């Protein structure tokens, strides 16, 4: 736990204000760490994922004697020090070779973790496609019903979306959609004794070709990395902590609009309630043909006088 620093000048105050919680969070920073023992394959995969995450990433070069599933206090320290919400750690041993541990934090405390082992790997340098421009926002596609049906694969889907989503934006030019991340898996078997299906991680670059219409024709070219993961240890988030992490501030929730509906076409339909109006004194356009004569006006005035006299006489009786 880092000590709380009181700002002594304006620069320190601005730096602390950047770390304060915001209604709309920006892109999440990820830290990339090496364990006490690593393999070249795990380090190469770590470097390729770091290239996909740039510029919202911090890469550590030194080894760290950290066992995330036994003691995550060091990871939480690095998370708070670097203001990072994500972490990936590369390790290697006889029991779990070529291992990557993916970690998410909430309030600089570990929210959930998952271990993915590297089974097959082909680096970015092995492909001749144009490299990714740092900061480009990817499209993400999950293939297979298992990502909605199985809790572990739902966990992977949520983590990858959180990891690669980048900075939130309102609009995006089609020319900025330069690559797509495809994550696929076969359907999981009901037999729990059998291992879970592999997670296939692919990255494709997009080529926009001219057509006779306004919409371009899209072609995909694999640009790497190409990785096959097998699922190892999983530490899901606790229900109360996850509920707190997913809570939305009241100011972010749009206020419901009364008496406003949207029809099947998408048109907004509103209902207005108006009080009953008194049309007796409504000023209308006067036309000569509708004007009353002098005799008609005198007769109506005499009738009103007679009615008033009758009312007075009834009251006196």
Swiss-Prot record:
PROSITE patterns: BRIX (PS50833)
Disulfide linkage: none
GO BP: assembly of large subunit precursor of preribosome; maturation of LSU-rRNA from tricistronic rRNA transcript (SSU-rRNA, 5.8S rRNA, LSU-rRNA); ribosomal large subunit biogenesis
Bias type Acidic residues, positions: 296-317
Gene Ontology annotations for the cellular component aspect, listed alphabetically: cytosol; nucleolus; nucleus; sno(s)RNA-containing ribonucleoprotein complex
Entry's localization field: Nucleus, Nucleolus
Domain of life per record: Eukaryota
Domain spans labelled Brix: 28-240
Sites bearing Phosphoserine, chain numbering: 293, 300, 313, 316
Keyword Phosphoprotein: yes
Region feature (Disordered): 287-317
GO molecular function, one term: rRNA binding
Alphabetic keyword roster: Nucleus, Phosphoprotein
Subunit note: Component of a hexameric 5S RNP precursor complex, composed of 5S RNA, rrs1, rpf2, rpl5a/rpl5b, rpl11a/rpl11b and syo1; this complex acts as a precursor for ribosome assembly.
UniProt record similarity statement: Belongs to the RPF2 family.
Protein name (database record): Ribosome production factor 2 homolog
Lineage: Eukaryota, Fungi, Dikarya, Ascomycota, Taphrinomycotina
């Amino acid at each position: 736990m880092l000590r709380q620093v009181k700002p002594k000048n304006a620069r320190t105050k601005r730096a602390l204000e950047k770390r304060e919680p915001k209604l709309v969070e920006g892109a999440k920073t990820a830290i990339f760490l090496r364990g006490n023992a690593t393999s070249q394959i795990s380090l190469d995969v770590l470097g390729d994922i770091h290239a996909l995450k740039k510029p919202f990433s911090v890469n550590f070069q030194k080894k760290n004697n950290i066992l995330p599933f036994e003691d995550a206090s060091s990871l939480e320290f690095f998370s708070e020090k670097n203001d990072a919400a994500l972490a990936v750690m590369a390790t290697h041993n006889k029991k779990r070779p070529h291992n990557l541990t993916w970690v998410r934090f909430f309030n600089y405390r570990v929210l959930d973790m998952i271990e993915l082992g590297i089974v097959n790997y082909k680096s970015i340098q092995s492909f001749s496609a144009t490299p990714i421009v740092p900061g480009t926002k990817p499209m993400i596609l999950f293939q297979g019903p298992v990502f909605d049906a199985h809790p572990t694969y739902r966990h992977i889907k949520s983590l990858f979306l959180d990891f690669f989503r980048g900075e939130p934006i309102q609009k995006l030019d089609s020319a900025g959609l330069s690559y797509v991340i495809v994550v696929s898996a076969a359907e999981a078997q009901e037999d729990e004794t059998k291992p879970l299906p592999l997670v296939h991680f692919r990255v494709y670059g997009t080529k926009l070709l001219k057509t006779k219409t306004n919409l371009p024709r899209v072609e995909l070219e694999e640009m790497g990395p190409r990785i096959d993961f097998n699922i190892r240890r999983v530490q899901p988030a606790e229900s109360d902590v996850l509920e707190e992490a997913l809570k939305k501030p009241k100011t972010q929730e749009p206020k419901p609009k009364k008496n406003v509906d949207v029809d099947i076409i998408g048109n907004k339909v509103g209902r207005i309630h108006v009080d009953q109006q008194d049309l007796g004194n409504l000023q209308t356009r006067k036309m000569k043909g509708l004007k009353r004569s002098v005799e008609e006006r005198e007769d109506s005035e005499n009738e009103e006088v007679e009615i008033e006299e009758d009312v007075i006489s009834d009251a006196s009786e």
